[in-house]
Amino acid sequence: VAQSFDTRTGLLERFGRPLRLAILGGGPGSWIGHMHRSAAELDGWWRVVGGVFSGDPARSRDGGALLGYDRERCYGTLDELVAGERARPDPAEAVAIMTPNDTHYPLAAAALDAGLDVVCDKPATHDAAQARDLVARTQRHGRLFAVAHGYSAYPMTRYARHLVNTGAIGELRYVQVEYVQSGLAPRIEDAPQNNRLRWVLDPRRSGLALVMSAIGCHAQHLASFAVNRRVTSVCADAISVVPNRE
């Protein structure tokens, strides 16, 4: 059941070093940023070398330096990052995107066009048309595009897939997945405008699917991965359990 780490050995033998990763988003105060940064370097495959750590250029440069990165590689915009890294003998080879949902598609598209491989937090895009465009760009430029569905790497998830694939559980008849979070249970609508979670309730930024794109995609991916089957059609009931929240 357990998989060996031959892939890692081959990677390090081929390159002789970890791959160089730049971060988009995830600066000081980010809820998800430290998770991505820590996970990226956990097994020695990647080394975070810098990035764009905020939509505000000054905050990005200061925030990246505060996190301990070389200020020279703490950029104000993605364009600056691409230009700055191209001029180096040791440029970033991929970017990891951990920004609000509405920026995933334009950042990923620009990074792919710049010749960078991309690891993107979910949801990858707001709609299927954007997703298809990213697929086309990835193929056109010969790059790699990955979505950060990290739960599929958990040993228990891998073991569940193994049980299904080997027929150990018998005929598959029904799959039930629950993914519960309470992060939006408080009325953040009443919080100050600079509250870091307010954007999640704005469909223009979070996407029309709102919470379904934020955490429902995890449930969908876990189900698909564990049973090794693709979803072919969808039907859903959606309700709000917080008063006066659509």
Regions found by a protein language model. Name each.
Residues 2-69:
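N-terminal Rossmann-like dinucleotide-binding module
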Residues 73-93:
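A structured beta-alpha segment of the ubiquitous adenosine-cofactor-binding alpha/beta core
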Residues 151-245:
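Predominantly a Rossmann-like dinucleotide-binding segment in NAD(P)-dependent oxidoreductases
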Residues 47-51, 71, 93-95, 210:
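Short active-site oxyanion
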Residues 94, 100-153, 167:
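Beta-strand-loop-alpha-helix segment that lines the small-molecule cofactor/substrate pocket
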